[in-house]
Every structure is written in C-alpha cells, then in structure tokens.
Swiss-Prot record:
Bias kind Gly residues: ranges: 233-248
Expression by tissue: Expressed in the vascular cylinder of roots. Expressed in the differentiation zone of the root stele.
Gene name of this polypeptide: NAC075
Keyword annotations of the record: Activator, Cell wall biogenesis/degradation, Developmental protein, DNA-binding, Nucleus, Transcription, Transcription regulation
Organism of provenance: Arabidopsis thaliana (Mouse-ear cress)
Name this polypeptide is given: NAC domain-containing protein 75
GO cellular component, one term: nucleus
C-alpha cells in the first residue's frame, strides 16, 4: 500500500486494509484464552469455520467499545479489529451509503464498525446524518430525487451492564427523498448506534460503535406488546397465573435475528389463561341436552313448548335436583317429562342413570295423573241433567281419594265424560235385558238411577216418600262399589215393591 499519498486521497478501504495489515504484523503469537504459542506465519492461518457469525449483544458491544476507548484500563481482544473495523474520515458511516461500506450486504447479516460522528455544521450540536450527494446520485440516478439521510426513530435507550448503566443506544433508519414538498420514503437499512456514558447524545469526537444491517423481514419487536394485551384480555388484566385450576396455553417464540439483528435474541413465553373449562362444558352441554330433549319430544309425539317454558337451570345439576325446583302444578313440560318419555320409548336406560330415570318415570306418571285430574275438574262438559241435579263437591273428591289407590292406574272416573256415559249406557242396556222381569217396574233409566243415587236425602224424599234412611244407605253402597257401578239390591227391591 502506498502511504505517501496525501491524506485527502486516502479512501476508507485503504484505511481498513492498513489496519488489518498492521494487526497481522503486530498480532499476538499466543492464544488469548490458554496462552498457547502460535507457530507459523499469519498468512498460513486458516479462517473461521463456515457458519460462525459475530452477533454480540448490546452489553457485549458496550464492553468492546469500552475496551477500545479505555485501552489503558481495559485490554482489548487481539482479534477485535477483525470483526469490528474502525472507519475514519469523510468516508465514514455518516457520509457513505451502507452499500458502499466494506462487508455490508443485503442478506440480512449485520456488520459492526467503530467510527466518530461528525457535526452537521461547524457551530451547534446537530450531528451530520446526510449521505454524500455523489453516492446518492449514483444510486438514485438523478440529483432531483431528493436527499438520503439517517433519521432517528424512538427514544434513546440505556444499556445496563451488571445493573449499572454503561452506555446508551439509539436506532436510526435510512430515508430517501428528503426535501421540501417531498414525502420521505423509508428504506430497509437500519443502524443501531452505541456510545458510552449516561447522556442521550455522544460527545464531540467520541468513538462509537454501530451495527448496520438490511432488514429482510418486517420488524417483530412489538410482538410482545400485542401478546401482553391478549394476556390482559384472556387472563383478567394481569400476568397469567400458573394455578387456579384449568389448563394454561403456552405460546413460545424465538425472536432470534430473523430480521437481520433488529431484535436481540430472546425467548418469550406467554401464558394465557382461558375461561373455566367446566363452565364452558356446562354451558355447551346444557345447550346440547336442550336440543336433544326437544328432538326426542318431537319424535315421541309430545306437544312442543317454547324454550322459556322448559327448565334447564342450572345445567350442571342432575335432573332430580331440577325436579325439586319445579312446581308440578305449572302445567308446563319440564326436562324430566321429556327425558322420561324418551326413556319409555327407547327402553334402553343407561346403567349409570337408572336410579334417576326410575325416579323421573314415577314422577312423570304422578304429574300426568295430576294434570288429568285438573283437566277433568276444569273442562268437564256440562250434561243437561247435571244442571238440575249437581252432586256435592266434597262427595266427588271423596270418591277420587277412595279410588286413588294405585298411582299407575287411570280410573274410569278420570276419563272424559263422553266415554264414561257411553260405557254406562251399554252396561245398563245389558243389565236391563238380563233382569227384564226384575226391572220391569222401573220408570227411570240406569243413568238417572246413578245420578239419583248420588243425590242428597232431600231429593230422595221428593221422589219417593219414606226413603230418606234408605238413600243414605244407597249412597254408601254406591261409594263402596263405585268401580263396577252395579245396581244395589235395596234399590231394586224398593222399585219392585213400590
């Protein structure tokens, strides 16, 4: 290299080559780790194996810078200039486009440099960040395309080493098309600049270290903030707890240096607590049971009811607990009715729910009997004779209580009035044919005798004199044999002798 050239004609590449040559000649002959003496000439040394990359952290870069600046107190690594070369003069980073810097490519790998920022003007503290016009013209094609300069983004961040602030870090992005009435265009060139001290701005002439890379992928540094908001929504606004029942979802992300080193290597584990699984299963299970019960009711031919008339509260409780909450006189179909009807048609009860289904079956028949009882008392059609002779209400309820000995048997008196009258007429006609001679003197039909037998003693006195005591006896006899409705002998003898 010709060192007799004037200082103004020395380029940045010549300075770097001189530094590398000087380091090779004056380099250490010992291994910095074990102290082993290295034999052979520097040109005989082999390089590092393929795949080895120089990717120091922020703290490590500050330590290298501190060792470079404070050479008396800290000993710099003998090979540090091989990985972080120093650029001086007007060919520095603040003047040269990143593509013109030695070793910088667009493959996303980062390159590190020691350099000294310069002022934009002779007076003031503003730093020069404008790229040289000549380089800008060669890249853009014309001078009318605007200026190209580094623009700081974000705030200056402190760099902590062992709990103490050793330096500061600022991030700059390269923009093009700067100028009046122009809209700057952002490029993918990024620079991280580090300087020593606690002040946000570096001192004049101070040596700094910068990392430059071409960002090949969108930055993902804000990914953790978006996931923290998701954690606040899913986990109740705080850090996800590891206990409390229910599972935890673990999301792992390795940021690495996929964007060319824009994000430092780190791993983040975000725990998102989902809602209680039992509540979800209860709610979904209750809805599925409701749909299944409605489908079973339609298949069994049961009357359809609105969803608000069915009792599905709460979903997680068994059907017998729901039965205690329901009032049997409401007249609406409950969940037990639907399930019992489905059980009766399928005839395949589950072994785990046989006890509950038997209880529901008994409750279902009892409720059907009560509903029919209410329907008979309310909607019983009025007979013309009943408007003249109406039996007492107490007698009617007494007969029902006497006959209600079997809860699974529907008695004849609980059937509709039309079927009851038809059966009684057919039975009375058969008895009249069988006892034609015996019943020849009767002037009333069998149905009228039945109604007359259920009347009070005063009515019997009006029809036939002197039969008040006999009417009470007939009333007791009718209550005793009300299931078969035979004609009492006393009444036959009375009519025969009358």
């Amino acid at each position: 290299m010709n060192k007799s050239n004037p200082a103004g004609s020395v380029t940045g590449s010549d300075i770097i080559d001189a530094k590398i040559e000087e380091h090779q000649l004056c380099g250490s002959k010992k291994c910095p780790s074990c102290g082993h003496k290295l034999e052979g000439k520097p040109q005989d040394w082999v390089g590092l194996p393929a795949g080895v990359k120089f990717d120091p952290t922020d703290q490590e870069l500050i330590e290298h810078l501190e060792a470079k600046v404070l050479a008396k107190d800290f000993k710099s690594h003998p090979l540090i200039d091989e990985f972080i070369p120093t650029i001086e003069g007007e060919d520095g980073i603040c003047y040269t486009h990143p593509e013109k810097l030695p070793g910088v490519t667009r493959d996303g790998l980062s390159r590190h440099f020691f350099h000294r920022p310069s002022k934009a003007y002779t007076t003031g503290t503003r730093k020069r960040r404008k790229i040289q016009t000549e380089c800008d013209n060669n890249l853009q094609g014309s001078s009318s395309s605007g200026e190209t300069r580094w623009h700081k983004t974000g705030k200056t961040r402190p760099v902590m080493v062992n709990g103490k602030q050793k330096g500061c870090k600022k991030i700059l992005v390269l923009y093009t098309n700067f100028g009046k009435n122009r809209k700057p265009e952002k490029t993918n060139w990024v620079m991280h600049q580090y300087h020593l001290g606690t002040h946000e701005e570096e001192k004049e002439g101070e040596l700094v270290v910068s990392k430059i890379f071409y960002q090949t992928q969108p930055r993902q540094c804000n990914w953790s903030s978006s996931t923290s908001s998701l954690n606040a929504i899913g986990g109740g606004g705080g850090e996800a707890s590891s206990g409390g029942g229910g599972g935890e979802y673990h999301m792992r992300r390795d940021s690495g240096t996929t964007s060319g080193g824009s994000c430092s290597s780190s791993r983040e584990i975000i725990n998102v607590n989902p809602p209680n699984r039992s509540d979800e299963i209860g709610g979904v299970g209750g809805g599925v049971m409701a749909v299944a019960a409605a489908a079973a009711a339609v298949a069994a031919g049961l009357p359809s009811y609105a969803m608000d008339q069915l009792s599905f509260v709460p979903f997680m409780k068994s059907f017998d607990e729901v039965a205690r909450r329901e009032t049997p006189q409401t007249g609406h179909a409950t969940c037990e009715d639907v399930m019992a009807e489905q059980h009766r048609h399928r005839h395949q009860p589950s072994s785990s729910t046989s006890h509950h289904m038997a209880h529901d079956h008994h409750h279902h028949h009892h409720q059907q009997q009560q509903q029919r009882h209410h329907a008979f008392n309310i909607s019983q059609p009025t007979h013309p004779i009943s408007t003249i002779i109406s039996p007492s209400t107490s007698l009617h309820h007494a007969s029902i209580n006497i006959l209600d000995d079997n809860p699974y048997h529907v008695h004849r008196i609980l059937l509709p009035n039309e079927n009851y009258q038809t059966q009684q007429q057919l039975r009375q006609e058969g008895e009249e044919e069988h006892n034609d001679g015996k019943m020849g003197g009767r002037s009333a039909s069998g149905l009228e005798e039945l109604i007359m037998g259920c009347t009070s003693s005063t009515t019997h006195h009006d029809v036939k004199d002197g039969s008040s005591s006999m009417g009470n006896q007939q009333e007791a006899e009718w209550l005793k044999y009300s299931t078969f409705w035979p004609a009492p002998d006393s009444s036959d003898n009375q009519d025969h002798h009358g």
